């Protein structure tokens, strides 16, 4: 009987102890410490902080767990929490309101996570925070007023991150430092401020001048854990210690060039040069009128610290390449620009270029192309350059064998495309672009022939054959058409010989020099061919008649 009573007593005591013991999360351990109740979760399988934390916790320590973010509302039942350790997890994001339920928080440790930035204004909800440990993350910047809401912070560790530039104002605006400045003689009763900045890839240029001065003169109340901040860049200062490096004052770029006026003969190569000096080193870009049509190589090379030489290489300059070339340099301080005027002198004969002239000595260079085929038609695109400063109007003429009257479209300044819709199958069309109201005979033309209608819209997607019926029109030969001519049943010379009766003795068309020979013109898209053999008009009489018109 005594033995039975003893067993009953043991079970009763065990039940009472279990009933009194507070709840603890699975995979975690709870304990009573001198500062209060503590929860430790090591190598948990959870992906977020559980929402059923035991109440009245003073410390939470979660480490080596797949924890990815701190979201708003995670700490709803933890208003008394003072110590939060979330080291060696995978935290990448801290939401702005994640800390709003932690008014008593005094210590936040986030070592060894994957943070790229910190929502510094979130610390408005934790005015009692004294320790902030962010080492071994991926933070690459700290705003100048980052610490303004951390009024009681005395320990900040942002070492082993990806910081390259930090203003000394970040630390001079530290509220604890400002408080010392205000108290003056009574400041000796305040705690020192511990700061850790080492093992960052510091870029030692003028932007770190203030921090370098701060490190050189650092002393109480500041204590640097490691004052040896090593420069990783620029190359000339790599490996040097920041406090031993002489850094100049930042300045915006200044630009110079050997010549602001450059004159060359057409067809010659030319290189425009631009020198930019700035601190920190500038970035250089070029702007010129035909940048959307002709793309030139740009070479950049450092001449000295803070001095960059940029070269714009123009191969086989054409008349249309003349104009203003703007060299632009910019850095974090400002930007500057310089204009270089390029003048391309014409040669006696200009094969490959087509000019439109008027009686008032106004001329224009025109490059007319068929750049795209749609289900219902084609898209024409052109490049025009006139010898007058004011913008010019152009007239687009579209005719066909079937149409009784030609279509006339007046094109205003700034427009360089036109869609031709509702094309008939098996029909030859001619599009000409003229200056102002000049007749189409004085413009540049492109001729295209639609293929047979092979069944519905799907067939119409492949009905276009761009072909050039006249040798004279080869001046406006689009890239797609030129590919067809060079790959068709005749070679280029034979085709011209068959189609140009006046030039059959020479076996070539002297004016038929295809544009884009140097591939410098950017062709938005070639014309789609349908795989059928291209047919040249069979009647020589029709060709000759077209040549007369």
Swiss-Prot record:
Chain ranges of the Fibronectin type-III domain: 361-447
Membrane topology: Single-pass type I membrane protein
Ig-like domain ranges (all copies): 253-339
Keywords, comma-separated and alphabetical: Disulfide bond, Glycoprotein, Immunoglobulin domain, Leucine-rich repeat, Membrane, Repeat, Signal, Transmembrane, Transmembrane helix
Subcellular location: Membrane
Protein name: Leucine-rich repeat, immunoglobulin-like domain and transmembrane domain-containing protein 2
Alphabetized SUPFAM superfamilies for the sequence: Fibronectin type III, Immunoglobulin, L domain-like
UniProt LRR repeat ranges: 80-103, 104-125, 128-149, 152-173
Positions of region (Disordered): 521-549
PANTHER family xrefs: LEUCINE-RICH REPEAT, IMMUNOGLOBULIN-LIKE DOMAIN AND TRANSMEMBRANE DOMAIN-CONTAINING PROTEIN 2, SYNAPTIC ADHESION-LIKE MOLECULE SALM
GO CC field: membrane
Domain LRRNT: 23-54
Statement: the UniProt record of this protein carries the keyword Disulfide bond: yes
Disulphides: 274-327
PROSITE patterns: IG_LIKE, LRR
Gene from which the chain derives: Lrit2
Ranges annotated as spanning the membrane: 463-483
Residues carrying a glycan: 90, 261, 491
Residues covered by the LRRCT domain: 200-252
Biased composition (Acidic residues): 538-549
Main location group: membrane
Assembly notes: Interacts with LRIT1; may form a heterodimer with LRIT1.
């Amino acid at each position: 009987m005594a033995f039975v009573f003893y067993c009953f007593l043991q079970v009763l005591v065990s039940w009472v102890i279990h009933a009194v013991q507070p709840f603890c999360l699975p995979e975690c351990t709870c304990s009573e410490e001198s500062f209060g109740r503590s929860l430790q979760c090591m190598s948990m399988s959870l992906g977020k902080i559980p929402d059923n934390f035991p109440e009245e916790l003073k410390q939470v320590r979660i480490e080596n767990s797949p924890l990815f973010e701190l979201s708003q509302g995670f700490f709803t039942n933890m208003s008394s929490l003072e110590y939060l350790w979330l080291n060696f997890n995978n935290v990448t994001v801290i939401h702005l309101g994640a800390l709003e339920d932690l008014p008593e928080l005094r210590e936040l440790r986030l070592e060894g996570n994957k943070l790229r930035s910190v929502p510094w204004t979130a610390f408005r909800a934790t005015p009692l925070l004294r320790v902030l440990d962010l080492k071994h993350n991926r933070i690459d910047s700290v705003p100048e007023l980052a610490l303004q809401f951390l009024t009681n912070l005395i320990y900040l560790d942002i070492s082993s991150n990806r910081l390259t530039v930090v203003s000394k104002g970040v630390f001079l605006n530290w509220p604890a430092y400002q408080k010392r400045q205000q108290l003056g003689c009574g400041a000796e009763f305040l705690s020192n401020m511990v700061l850790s900045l080492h093992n960052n890839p510091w870029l030692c240029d003028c932007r770190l001048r203030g921090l370098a001065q701060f490190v050189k003169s650092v002393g109480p109340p500041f204590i640097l854990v490691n004052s040896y901040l090593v420069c990783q860049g620029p190359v000339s200062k790599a490996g040097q210690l920041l406090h031993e490096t002489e850094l100049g004052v930042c300045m915006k770029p200044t630009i110079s060039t050997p010549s602001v006026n450059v004159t060359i003969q057409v067809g010659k190569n030319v290189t425009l040069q631009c020198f930019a000096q700035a601190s920190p080193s500038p970035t250089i870009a070029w702007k010129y009128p035909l940048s959307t049509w002709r793309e030139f190589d740009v070479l950049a090379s450092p001449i000295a610290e803070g001095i960059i030489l940029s070269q714009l290489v123009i191969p086989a300059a054409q008349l249309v390449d003349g104009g203003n070339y703007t060299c632009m340099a910019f850095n974090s301080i400002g930007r500057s620009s310089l204009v270089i005027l390029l003048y391309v002198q014409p040669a006696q004969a200009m094969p490959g270029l087509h000019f439109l002239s008027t009686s008032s000595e106004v001329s224009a260079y025109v490059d007319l192309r068929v750049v795209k085929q749609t289900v219902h038609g084609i898209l024409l695109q052109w490049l025009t350059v006139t010898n007058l400063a004011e913008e010019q109007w152009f007239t687009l003429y579209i005719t066909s064998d079937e149409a009784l009257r030609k279509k006339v479209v007046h094109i205003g300044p700034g427009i360089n495309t036109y869609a031709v819709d509702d094309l008939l199958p098996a029909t030859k069309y001619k599009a000409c672009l003229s200056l102002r109201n000049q007749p189409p005979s004085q413009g540049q033309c492109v001729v295209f022939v639609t293929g047979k209608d092979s069944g519905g819209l799907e067939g119409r997607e492949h009905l276009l054959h761009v072909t050039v019926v006249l040798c004279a029109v080869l001046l406006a030969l689009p890239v797609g058409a030129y590919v067809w001519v060079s790959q068709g049943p005749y070679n280029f010379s034979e085709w011209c010989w068959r189609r140009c009766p006046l030039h059959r003795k020479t076996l070539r068309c002297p004016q038929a020099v295809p544009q884009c020979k140097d591939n410098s013109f950017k062709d938005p898209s070639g014309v789609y061919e349908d795989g059928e053999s291209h047919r040249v008009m069979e009647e020589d009489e029709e060709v000759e008649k077209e040549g007369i018109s």
